[in-house]
Every structure is written in C-alpha cells, then in structure tokens.
Regions:
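C-terminal beta-sandwich interaction modules and adjacent acidic
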Residues: 1-154
Length: 154
C-alpha cells in the first residue's frame, strides 16, 4: 500500500519523556513533521540543564514502534526497532540554564514502512534523543522522543 504526503494529516505532537529525571530538558525540533522513506530527517536537539551537571554525551536516532491491538484476543508484545545511533557530542558541558543547540541529520531507510493505524496493529515512527552523564553518579540517563509521520510515496 502506498501512502503519500497528501494522504496524511500531520501536526507536531508534544515531546514524550521516556526516561530520566529531566535534570536536563531536551527538546527536539524538526524541519517538518512528515518524511518520505529514504529521506533525511533534519533537526536540532536543544539541551537546557536545570542545574550544573556532569558533562554529557548526546546521540539521536529514528525509532519504529509496532503496537498490537487486536479486537478479539489479548494484544501481542509489539516491538521497537532503533535506527543507527548518530552521536551529536561527547563531554558536552552542562551548566545551569545555559542552552546547548546541536543540529542533526538522520537518514531514514529507503524501505521504511509508512506510519499506519489499522484494526489490529499500528506502526509509529519517532526521533529519539538520549543523554548520558559522565562518571559514576546518581544522574539517570535522559531519553525523549518526538513522533514523526513516515510515508512511502510523494
């Protein structure tokens, strides 16, 4: 089935915090909400620490999620697939209230299945960012994701 940009209504959904204590607020800004399979996702990640923190390592990737929601039986496990990790910076200084902006480009696979919702299952796409803090300390991994729509026809 071919799904093109004219077939979808897309809007920017709120950023989802997946894990962490939000000691550093991470925002993902994208050039657009809809991408064609094989296209490059262009955007930027903005880190805004809430306090002085150990230096951090930031990386981004695409994520495909399949949800199972059958009508007549228990849902299956679904699953997630993460794309190639794109490192954006190592040992980034994280100082209270000082934003750090890092641009990125993430290539989508040419054979990426489109975002779709059907009776029994759905496929959703995201851009995710993850921030690791340096050293052995009490600071948790921070992870966020923003949904995108993937189509397979112009």
């Amino acid at each position: 089935m071919l799904i093109g940009t004219a077939d979808v209504e897309a809007y920017v959904e709120p950023l989802e915090v997946v894990s962490g204590a939000v000691e550093t607020a991470i925002d993902i800004t994208l050039s657009k909400p809809v991408y064609l399979a094989g296209e490059t996702i262009i955007g930027q990640a903005t880190l805004t620490p809430t306090m002085d923190l150990p230096d951090g390592d930031l990386a981004v990737s695409w994520q495909r999620e399949r949800e199972s929601h059958p009508l007549t039986r228990a849902p299956g496990p679904g699953g997630q697939l993460d794309g190639r990790i794109v490192p954006l910076g190592k040992r980034i200084p994280l100082r209270a209230g000082v934003p750090v902006v890092l641009p990125f480009e993430i290539p989508l696979p040419a054979d990426a299945p489109p975002t779709a919702a059907a009776v029994h299952s759905s496929i959703n796409w995201f851009v995710q960012a993850r921030l690791f803090y340096a050293g052995f300390n009490a600071h948790q991994l921070e992870r966020v994701r923003r949904s995108i729509v993937v189509v397979n026809a112009p």
